[in-house]
C-alpha cells in the first residue's frame, strides 16, 4: 500500500482563473502559492498541517516538498489538475498525473456534484466537515487583485499584513478544504475506481498539459475586425430604424409593427422564418439580417482563445474528464470545442487564407457577412505543431452501432458489417422497399436518417421535430415515421423495456439483474449501478421509486445535477434514457481504448471532440492515417461482434471533412 497525502492550496494571480483556465493563470508573472494544507493518511483526520508561504516553517515545507516529489507517495486533491499545474509551475518540477488521484473525478463517477461544497452537501457531511462558506469573500480579498483606492493607499493587492484577522480565517478555510476533501474520499472509498479509469485520467491530464496550437495572429485579426464590423452594423441599424437602441426587443418590435410586420417574438427561428418571405420590405429584411449577424456569439470563442492561450500559443485545459456524469464522456472547457458550427462554406481553405491575411473585404464579397464566416472558421484556428499535420479520425455512426449491438438488432449490425448506408437500410426496413441514396426511393432516406437520429432512445414526435430542423417531414407524418421505425427495430424497443424493468427490479428487490453483452444492473447502499461491458459502472445516486400524482405511476427517480439549472435535485429517468446513457457510455469506452492504442504507438493526441480524435503527426509519417484508422476499427476484447470503423482524413488545420 502506498502512503497517501491529501493536498489543497490557495493561490494568487492577476489572470482571471474562470476566464483563462489554470494553465494561463499560472503563467502570470505575479502567480504565487499563498497557503498549502496537507495531511497523510496515517496521521489521523484532525492533524492537517498548514504552510503559510509568507512565513513558512522550513521543516514543514521540507516535509511537504519531499512527499510531493516522492513517486511512491500518492497525492490526492479535489480537482487535482489545479494543484498539479500550480505546484509544477511554483516548484518548476513536473507533477506526473500517475502519482495523483482526483477526488473530484471520483465524485463525478458516482454522479455527484463536481464542486467541493456541492459534493459534501450531497453526501450529507456533518457541519464540521463541510466546506467553509466564507471562502469566496476571502478568495476575492487575498487571491485576486484589488481596486486601488485612497483608503487602501492605491495598492492593487491585499497581503496578510493588510488584514491579519482575515488572513487567519483564510488559513482556517484552506485547512477546512482538506478536511472536507478527505471526508469525501473516506465516504467514497467503498466504491472502487477501476485501474483502467485511473490510467485514462492520466492520459487525459497529459493531453491537457500538452494542449493544442492556435493560430494566434489570425485570431487577433478576426477579433479586431469583428469589433469594428459590429460597431458598423450597429450604426447601420440605428440609421435604418431611427431607434436609439435597435438591440432593444421592445423598441424593435414597435418599429417592425410600424413597417407592417407583426412578430410576436424576435428569435433566431422567427427571424429565419420572416426572411423566407419574398414580400418582406427591403429595409426590414436588412434590419433583421443585421440583428442575426450581431446575434452570432460564436466570435466570443476567439476572444476566449486570446485570454486563455499560453505564451507558446497553445491552448490547454479544454477537456474535462468525466464531465458528462451520466455517461462518463468528456465535457468541453473554455472554448467549448464540443459546440462548434458546421462547415458549410464552399471553400473553407480560401476563407481561412483571407482571414489569416486580414483581407476581410474580399471575404465579405465572396462569402457574405463576416460574422457567419467567422463562426465556421473557429475550428481552423486550431493548428498542428510545427513540422506536423493533423490526422482526424472518428468512429462512423458509433452510437447506432453500439445501440444495435447491445440490443441484438441483427439486421442493423449486418448492414454495418457490409458497409451499407444505415439511413437507406433503415428506411428500407421501415417501408419494405429498396432505398438507394441516389437511386430507387431515395426520397425515403431522409425519413430513415431522422428516425435513426431521433428514435433510438424512445424518442417520439418531439424528438423527430428537434432532429428534423429543416422540417423535411410533414408534421402529420411524424408519428407514422416513429411507429415504422419501432416496428423495424423490435430488439431496441425490447431493450428499453428490459432496462426499465431491470432498474425497477433492483430498486425493489436489491438484487443483480443481468442483460446481454455484460450489462448488469445492481443496487448498493441505495444507489443504482449499471455495469458496462468494459467493467466500468454508471451510478445513479440515491435511486428510488416515487409516485407521481399526475399519472398515478411510480417513476424511477435519482439525485443528480440538473443539466439545465445545474442544481442538485431529483431527476427522473426511464427505459429509453437508461439505454441512451448505456449506449453513450460504451461509445465513450470505445473511444478511450482507441486513444490509448493511438498513444501507445507514440502519437500525440492534442484533443478529441465527441467521437473523433485529433492527432499531431509529423509530416514525414505517411502511414499515420492508415494506422490511426486501424486503431479505431480494431476489435475490442469486451465487445465481441461490435462492428467498429474509423474514418479519417489529413488536414493542415482542424476542420470537419
What are these regions (language model features)?
Residues 422-442, 551-606:
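Generic long, charged, amphipathic alpha-helical segments
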Residues 13, 81-93, 110, 254-258, ...:
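Short active-site loop/helix that positions an aromatic residue
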Residues 1-17, 28-31, 35-37, 46-47, ...:
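Conserved "right-hand" nucleotidyltransferase catalytic core of DNA-directed polymerases
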Residues 28-34, 38-189, 346, 426-431, ...:
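Active-site-proximal helix-loop-helix substrate-binding element of RNase H-like nuclease domains
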Residues 188-200, 590-613:
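Active-site palm subdomain of RNA-directed nucleic acid polymerases
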Residues 6-7, 78, 99-102, 382-398:
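Conserved catalytic palm subdomain of right-hand nucleotidyl-transferase polymerases, strongest
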Residues 1-3, 65-69, 373-389, 596-600:
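A short acidic-Thr-Gly-centered motif at the start of a beta-strand
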Residues 631-639:
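A common structural junction motif
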Amino acid at each position: 500500500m502506498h502512503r497517501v497525502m491529501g493536498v489543497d492550496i490557495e493561490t494568487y494571480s492577476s489572470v482571471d482563473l474562470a476566464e483563462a483556465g489554470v494553465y494561463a493563470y499560472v503563467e502570470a508573472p505575479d502567480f504565487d502559492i499563498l497557503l498549502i494544507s496537507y495531511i497523510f493518511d496515517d496521521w489521523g483526520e484532525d492533524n492537517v498541517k498548514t504552510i503559510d508561504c509568507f512565513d513558512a516553517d522550513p521543516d514543514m515545507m521540507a516535509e511537504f516538498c519531499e512527499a510531493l516529489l516522492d513517486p511512491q507517495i500518492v497525492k490526492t486533491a479535489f480537482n487535482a489538475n489545479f494543484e498539479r499545474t500550480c505546484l509544477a509551475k511554483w516548484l518548476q518540477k513536473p507533477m506526473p498525473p500517475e502519482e495523483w488521484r482526483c477526488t473530484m473525478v471520483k465524485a463525478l463517477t458516482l454522479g455527484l456534484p463536481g464542486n467541493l461544497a456541492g459534493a459534501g452537501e450531497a453526501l450529507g457531511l456533518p457541519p464540521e466537515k463541510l466546506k467553509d462558506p466564507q471562502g469566496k469573500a476571502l478568495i476575492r480579498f487575498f487571491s485576486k487583485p484589488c481596486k486601488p483606492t485612497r483608503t487602501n493607499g492605491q495598492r492593487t493587492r491585499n497581503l496578510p499584513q493588510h488584514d491579519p484577522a482575515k488572513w487567519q480565517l483564510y488559513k482556517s478555510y484552506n485547512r477546512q478544504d482538506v478536511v472536507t476533501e478527505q471526508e469525501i474520499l473516506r465516504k467514497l472509498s467503498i466504491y472502487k475506481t477501476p485501474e483502467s479509469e485511473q490510467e485514462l485520467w492520466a492520459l487525459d491530464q497529459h493531453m491537457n498539459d500538452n494542449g493544442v496550437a492556435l493560430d494566434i495572429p489570425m485570431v487577433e485579426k478576426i477579433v479586431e475586425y469583428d469589433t469594428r464590423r459590429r460597431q458598423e452594423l450597429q450604426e447601420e441599424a440605428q440609421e435604418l430604424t431611427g431607434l436609439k437602441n435597435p438591440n432593444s426587443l421592445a423598441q424593435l418590435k414597435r418599429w417592425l409593427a410600424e413597417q407592417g410586420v407583426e412578430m410576436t417574438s424576435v428569435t433566431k427561428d422567427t427571424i429565419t422564418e420572416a426572411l423566407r418571405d419574398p414580400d418582406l420590405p427591403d429595409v426590414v429584411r436588412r434590419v433583421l439580417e443585421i440583428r442575426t449577424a450581431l446575434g452570432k456569439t460564436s466570435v466570443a470563442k476567439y476572444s476566449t482563445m486570446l485570454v486563455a492561450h499560453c505564451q507558446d500559443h497553445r491552448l490547454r485545459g479544454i477537456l474535462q474528464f468525466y464531465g458528462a456524469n451520466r455517461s462518463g464522456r468528456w465535457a468541453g472547457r473554455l472554448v467549448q470545442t464540443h459546440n462548434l458550427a458546421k462547415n458549410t462554406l464552399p471553400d473553407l481553405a480560401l476563407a481561412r487564407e483571407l482571414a489569416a491575411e486580414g483581407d476581410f473585404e474580399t471575404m465579405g464579397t465572396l462569402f457574405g457577412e463576416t460574422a457567419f464566416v467567422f463562426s465556421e472558421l473557429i475550428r481552423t484556428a486550431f493548428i498542428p505543431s510545427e513540422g506536423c499535420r493533423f490526422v482526424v479520425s472518428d468512429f462512423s455512426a458509433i452510437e447506432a452501432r453500439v445501440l444495435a449491438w447491445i440490443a441484438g438488432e441483427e439486421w442493423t449490425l449486418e448492414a454495418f458489417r457490409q458497409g451499407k448506408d444505415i439511413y437507406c437500410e433503415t428506411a428500407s426496413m421501415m417501408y419494405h422497399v429498396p432505398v438507394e441514396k441516389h437511386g430507387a426511393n431515395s426520397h425515403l432516406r431522409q425519413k430513415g436518417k431522422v428516425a435513426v437520429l431521433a428514435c433510438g432512445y424512445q424518442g417520439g414526435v418531439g424528438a423527430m421535430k428537434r432532429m428534423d430542423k429543416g422540417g423535411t417531414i410533414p408534421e402529420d407524418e411524424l408519428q407514422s415515421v416513429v411507429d415504422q421505425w419501432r416496428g423495424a427495430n423490435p430488439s431496441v424497443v425490447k431493450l428499453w423495456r428490459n432496462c426499465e424493468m431491470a432498474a425497477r427490479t433492483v430498486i425493489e428487490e436489491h438484487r443483480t439483474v443481468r442483460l446481454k453483452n455484460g450489462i448488469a444492473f445492481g443496487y448498493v447502499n441505495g444507489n443504482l449501478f449499471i455495469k458496462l461491458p468494459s467493467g466500468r459502472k454508471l451510478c445513479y445516486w440515491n435511486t428510488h421509486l416515487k409516485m407521481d400524482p399526475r399519472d398515478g405511476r411510480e417513476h424511477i427517480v435519482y439525485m443528480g445535477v440538473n443539466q439545465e439549472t445545474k442544481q442538485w435535485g431529483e431527476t427522473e429517468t426511464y427505459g429509453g434514457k437508461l439505454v441512451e446513457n448505456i449506449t453513450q457510455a460504451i461509445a465513450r469506452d470505445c473511444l478511450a481504448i482507441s486513444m490509448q492504442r493511438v498513444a501507445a504507438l507514440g502519437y500525440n493526441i492534442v484533443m478529441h471532440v465527441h467521437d473523433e480524435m485529433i492527432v499531431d503527426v509529423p509530416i514525414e509519417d505517411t502511414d499515420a492515417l492508415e494506422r490511426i484508422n486501424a486503431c479505431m476499427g480494431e476489435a475490442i476484447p469486451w465487445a465481441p461482434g461490435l462492428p467498429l470503423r474509423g474514418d479519417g482524413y489529413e488536414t493542415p488545420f482542424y476542420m470537419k471533412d
